[in-house]
């Protein structure tokens, strides 16, 4: 069956679903999307104005080819829509020279010939004085990196899909996905529709929608906090890279596009279990701010320790931190993308393209064999 004749449902038009809808529609599929809210909402993982894009990968260098594919698609989506969805300002990875993540990022840079610069502690302190450097620290500046605008990206990808013929049902919760003869049935409160295939990108609602999923996706609650610097020029000058610190406490941050504040976030280990995604606790308790105060005092003393803004989001994590990507067992026409474990947004155009491959062709030429693909267990 050709893409032009294939009818594909996209369940969840968020980070992954909006990209999948765009790539499917671009290939001529008849696309119908469903979202319990509307593209660009802040009820799950996408929000907070910025996400980091980087080319060097400190978790696993095998992601780099996917990042390169995503990079090309970011450029393509911007060109097709005329919107600035990301800005390449660089990204600093800082930490002890002996830390494993520093070794892995240098490995990924060497293997894939990535544009970068290595800074020792002296050079780092001189060039980026806003960071307090510890003995033994070094940094890698990933030049093909910067920030993404998440809400704008999702809305832009969804609108581009609609321009290409997709239909998106907003504020429409999918209650059930039922494989049927030669297709799949999507059931909502408004009724049901049948499709040839479905791409399921439910975000933190994965366990609600697929309660019998044989793999664990743990939904965690994460806090983003914004702080105003005392010396704005240090953060918002000619160089204003995003940053990641590996140790002793893993954290990340981005100078905000408005030139006023700096956003900080924490690693998975410091995120609470979210519980029911429909009842997310969005109140940030004072004790949750203590770790931010400690980080600022130790590594970024130029930031005022009282946050000017706090936001709470949800993210799905797998045990391996690798996503679930592929057809569900016993339902080859239902393609799942879930559990991106905090690393999905920068890769979302690539995974949207992979979802289109799997939905239309049943396979993808992209190098995803190392991922914990649905239907098998990664050794």
Where are these regions (language model features)?
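Conserved Rossmann-like nucleotide-cofactor binding loop
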Residues: 16, 39, 205
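Glycine-rich FAD pyrophosphate-binding loop
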Residues: 26-46
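Active-site substrate-recognition segment that forms the wall
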Residues: 22-26, 84-86, 192, 197, ...
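N-terminal Rossmann-like FAD-binding beta1-loop-alpha1 element of flavoenzymes
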Residues: 7-33
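Dinucleotide-binding Rossmann-like beta1-alpha1 core, especially the glycine-rich loop
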Residues: 50-127, 250
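C-terminal catalytic lobe of FAD-dependent flavoproteins
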Residues: 294, 298-379
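Flavin (FAD/FMN) cofactor-binding and adjacent substrate-gating region
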Residues: 96-164, 169-170, 176-179
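Predominantly flavin-linked oxidoreductase catalytic cores and closely associated redox partners
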Residues: 148-233
């Amino acid at each position: 069956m050709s893409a032009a004749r294939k009818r594909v449902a996209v369940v969840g038009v968020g980070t992954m679903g909006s990209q999948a809808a765009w790539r499917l529609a671009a290939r001529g599929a008849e696309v119908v999307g469903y979202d319990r809210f509307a593209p660009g909402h802040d009820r799950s993982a996408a929000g907070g104005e910025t996400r980091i894009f980087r080319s060097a990968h400190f978790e696993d260098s095998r992601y780099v080819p996917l990042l390169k594919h995503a990079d090309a698609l970011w450029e393509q989506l911007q060109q097709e829509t005329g919107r600035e969805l990301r800005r390449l300002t660089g990204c600093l990875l800082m930490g002890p020279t002996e830390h494993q993540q520093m070794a892995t990022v240098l490995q990924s840079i060497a293997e894939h010939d990535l544009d970068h610069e290595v800074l020792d502690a002296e050079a780092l302190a001189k060039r980026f004085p806003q960071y307090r450097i510890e003995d033994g620290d070094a940094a890698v500046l990933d030049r093909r990196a910067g920030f993404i605008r998440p809400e704008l990206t999702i809305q832009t990808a969804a609108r581009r899909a609609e321009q290409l013929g997709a239909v998106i049902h907003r504020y429409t919760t999918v209650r059930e996905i039922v494989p049927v003869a030669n297709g799949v049935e999507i059931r909502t409160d408004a009724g049901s529709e049948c499709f040839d295939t479905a791409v399921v990108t439910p975000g933190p609602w994965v366990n609600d929608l697929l309660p019998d999923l044989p793999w664990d996706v743990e939904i965690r609650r994460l806090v983003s906090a914004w702080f105003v610097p005392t010396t704005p020029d240090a953060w918002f000058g000619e160089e204003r890279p995003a940053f990641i610190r590996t140790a002793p406490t893993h954290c990340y941050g981005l100078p905000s596009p408005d030139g006023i504040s700096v956003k900080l976030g924490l690693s998975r280990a410091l995120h609470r279990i979210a519980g029911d995604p429909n009842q997310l606790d969005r109140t940030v308790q004072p004790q949750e701010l203590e770790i931010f105060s400690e980080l600022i005092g130790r590594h970024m003393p130029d930031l005022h320790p009282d946050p000017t803004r706090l936001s709470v989001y949800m993210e799905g994590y797998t045990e391996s931190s690798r996503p679930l990507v592929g057809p569900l067992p016993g339902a080859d026409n239902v393609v799942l993308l879930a559990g991106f474990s905090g690393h999905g947004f920068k890769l979302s155009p690539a995974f949207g393209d992979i979802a289109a491959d799997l939905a239309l062709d049943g396979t993808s030429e992209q190098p995803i064999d190392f991922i914990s693909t649905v239907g098998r267990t990664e050794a």
